[in-house]
Design a protein with these regions (language model features):
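Membrane-embedded alpha-helical bundles of multi-pass transporters/translocases
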Residues: 1-537
Length: 537
């Protein structure tokens, strides 16, 4: 990746950017993990978290869809601004910000007024008390609609200007706000925090902390954006700027496409409302998976998006195909070890992360099978995103949108078929099935559009890594079982050692097996890790 130019004035390598993003995202994810541990210890899988899981669906959907790094706002702005000077970028950013803010302000009012209808549609199976709490929480978090759009614009604008540290780090402010809110409540009421008389207050604090966190995240970005000369907080309605229409051409279909994908989450939660504590279990399990997934997706998708955008002409397709392969193989090399760990070591992972306070053994047993299902789908989730970014780079947001439309109906059908026989894990497996189908469709279309892809070569490499993943999972399970038989797992110290040993076995076996395949992408990863450690030592 040496010598790859990310902007006109920057000379950072692709791997260098990935390193910056990875470190910043890791810090954010650590704070996110602490946030989830605080919530789990305070409320377990009870009504507060269950209501919050449903109330957060729409604000969270908007924050991920519009405000997320790698989201459509981010992708559209990077693809357009990366080709322009700062003097051209500011008016584009200000115009897009004005339009987005006006639309999302109306969305905020709509959410507040009709919160009860949204909750009833999302979760018809909720009991009266949980429903009431979810409605209140949604009304509190509704202004996150506007903040989500502003955060997404800030992500894309700063990345296009070769600023990666702050955008990747800023989500930690949201986590800190929730930690402070729940922590203060726990300090005031003590062990009674999960008692019935404090349930409503707990829901209010959780939702309020989330809103304050989103506001804090945006304020952290906007200063850097203004300082860099990338647009000020002013109203601008100049739609004649060429770059504005170019951004909208990518942003609108990309937003619709990503929105269709997140409708699958709505569908999952609709069925989850009929399964006791399913929403809370999915929340806790998904966060464990999203921690490494978020770090690796930012490492892979953030630096690759500008590269894809510069290789869209036919004369550059040979290199574009190489970059697509790199994206997919790096995805496999980073995701599959976690798949082995989350399937083979699901119970030790959940026990170490969550099992304390109100989160007891019964709660762990509910979350474990859900974590295994999420772990199985990690590669397909991120691999689909890699291929979608290729379409965005080609200026085609329509194809992902059409595929997402088909997937809505497929996901609903799979949810209906799987939720009764498999319970909560069945809902997760339905989404995994949708992602597998999406990857297949995108691969076939790109194969035709780019004049053929070396699918046989790619497939053999991925098949080899799959076999290695299975073997490393079996080895890590054996190590965990052996440790518990010999030393036990009666305290957190022994549990940490057990999980650390078994995880090391999984990663070690995976690396040994992957080395036999002689993949250049593995050499790249290893060289980057060595460089990082050598710099620190």
């Amino acid at each position: 990746f040496r010598g790859v130019i990310i902007t006109k004035k920057a000379t950072r390598s692709l791997a260098g950017i990935a390193g910056i993003v990875a470190v910043a995202t890791l810090i954010s994810k650590v704070f996110g993990l602490v946030r989830e541990q605080v919530i789990a210890a305070a409320y377990g899988v009870g009504p507060v978290v269950n209501a919050y899981a449903f109330a957060y669906v729409i604000p969270g959907f908007l924050l991920i869809l519009l405000g997320g790094i790698n989201g459509p706002f981010h992708s559209a702005l990077v693809s357009v601004l990366a080709k322009r000077d700062k003097s051209e970028s500011a008016p584009i950013v200000e115009t897009i910000t004005t339009l987005v803010s006006a639309i999302l302000l109306a969305v905020t009012v709509f959410l507040i007024v009709f919160a009860n209808i949204f909750i009833d549609v999302l979760a018809p199976g909720l009991d009266a008390a949980t429903r009431s709490m979810a409605i209140q929480q949604l009304q509190i978090m509704a202004p996150m609609a506007v903040l989500a759009g502003l955060i997404g614009i800030g992500f894309g604008t700063l990345n296009a200007a070769d600023q990666y540290w702050l955008p990747s780090l800023s989500p930690l402010f949201s986590s800190v706000a929730v930690i402070i809110g729940v922590g203060l409540l726990a300090w005031f009421v003590g062990d009674r925090i999960d008692e019935p008389q404090y349930v409503q207050l707990g829901g209010f604090v959780l939702a309020g902390g989330t809103l304050v966190g989103a506001l804090w995240q945006w304020l952290a970005q906007v200063g850097a954006q203004v300082k860099a000369g990338l647009g000020k907080l002013i109203f601008r309605w100049d739609w004649r700027i060429p770059g504005v229409s170019e951004v909208l051409r990518v942003m609108i279909p990309a937003t619709l496409s990503s929105g269709m994908l997140h409708i699958n989450v709505y569908t999952d939660l609709f069925f989850a409302s009929f399964i006791e504590n399913a929403a809370a279990s999915m929340r806790y399990a998904s966060f464990i998976v999203l921690t490494p997934l978020g770090i690796m997706s930012n490492m892979i998708l953030v630096p690759f998006m500008p590269i894809f955008s510069r290789l869209t002409e036919p004369e550059n397709w040979v290199e574009l195909k190489q970059r697509i392969r790199q994206g997919l193989l790096l995805t496999a090399l980073t995701m599959l070890p976690f798949t082995a760990i989350f399937i083979a070591l699901a119970f030790p992972v959940v026990r170490v992360i969550y099992q304390r306070g109100a989160f007891n053994l019964a709660a762990s047993e509910q979350v474990v099978p859900v974590l295994m299902a999420y772990g199985f789908g990690m590669f397909f989730y991120l691999g689909r995103d890699v291929l979608v970014r290729v379409f965005y780079a080609l200026g085609d947001g329509e194809t992902p949108f059409k595929v997402s439309m088909v997937n809505i109906f497929l996901n609903g059908a799979l949810d209906f078929l799987l939720y009764k026989p498999f319970g909560t894990p069945g809902l997760v497996l339905a989404t995994v099935g949708v992602n597998i189908l999406s990857m297949g469709i995108f691969t076939v279309i790109l194969n035709r559009r780019l004049g053929g892809l070396p699918l046989g070569e790619w497939g053999l490499s991925l098949l080899g890594l799959t076999v290695i993943t299975m073997l490393s999972g079996v080895g890590s399970w054996g190590a965990s079982w052996g440790w518990e038989k010999v030393f036990g797992a009666g305290n957190i110290f022994l549990q940490l050692l057990q999980l650390g040993l078994a995880s090391t076995v999984a990663v070690g076996l995976f690396l040994l097996g992957a080395m036999l395949l002689k993949l250049p992408e593995l050499d790249l990863l290893i060289s980057r890790v060595r460089q990082k450690f050598l710099k620190k030592s």
